[in-house]
A protein has these predicted regions:
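Conserved lysine of the Walker
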Residues: 34
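Small-molecule kinase domains that catalyze NTP-dependent phosphoryl transfer to phosphate-bearing small molecules
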Residues: 128-131, 136-184, 191-195
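ATP-dependent NMP and nucleoside kinases share a basic, alpha-helical "lid"
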Residues: 63-74, 84-146, 153
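Extreme N-terminal, non-catalytic leader segments
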Residues: 1-23
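Hydrophobic anchor at the beta1->P-loop junction of P-loop NTPases
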Residues: 26
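Conserved substrate/cofactor phosphate-moiety recognition/catalytic segment
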Residues: 39-87, 91
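The conserved Walker
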Residues: 30
Length: 195
């Protein structure tokens, strides 16, 4: 299969939008605040008249990734598919805010490489909270179900979460407010001339 280029380039779309397409990839334990921070960043960007779109790992499991479970292979495929969706959206000039556990360092690195090959900015943001904090929040009751044996292969309970070693930003979400975390992400986008 051969790639088919159109007449309109990414530069044309970015010029039209007045921003650069990019991906902000929020990673962390379930209950760390990834989606909550992404929602706050989205509100700030849209308030500043910047086009962005949230790609939430849970939401994708209702459609595109509906057929995937939580085994290591399925998690890897979940991250790969999500990365492809983010790459396509970023190529349109949109700022993509992706939030998913993505527990394995190697899979996140593959997504980073995918964006590098497409010459698209990719920023990994680690929403860092201790397991005890994430488990005490448990907004979806997933830790409770995992501890009761109702969910297998759950990150933090049955499988490890591999924290980033070279991410662009670490948010200490156990000690900082959602708003403070969102401000740091927006500032990172400004510093990198995305917005």
């Amino acid at each position: 299969v051969t790639w088919h280029d159109g007449q309109i380039s990414r530069v044309d779309r970015e010029r039209l939008l007045g921003q650069r397409g990019a991906v902000v990839w929020f990673t962390g334990l379930s209950g760390s605040g990834k989606s909550t921070v992404a929602v706050a960043v989205e509100a700030r960007l849209l308030g500043a008249r910047r086009l962005c779109y949230r790609v939430d790992g849970d939401n994708l499991r209702h459609g595109l990734n509906k057929n995937l479970g939580f085994s290591p292979d399925d998690r890897a495929e979940n991250v790969r598919r999500t990365g492809e969706v983010c790459r396509i959206l970023a190529d349109t000039g949109v700022i993509v805010l992706a939030s998913l556990v993505s527990p394995f360092r190697a899979e996140r690195e593959r997504v980073r490489q995918m964006h590098a090959e497409a010459n698209l900015p990719f920023m990994e943001v680690f929403v860092d909270v201790p397991l005890e904090v994430a488990e005490s929040r448990d907004p979806k009751g997933l830790y409770r179900k995992a501890r009761a044996g109702e969910i297998k292969d759950f990150t933090g309970v049955h499988q490890p979460y591999e924290a980033p070693t070279a991410c662009e930003l670490t948010l200490p979400a156990a000690t900082q407010s959602v708003d403070a975390c969102a401000l740091q992400v927006v500032q990172m986008l400004r510093d990198r001339h995305i917005v």
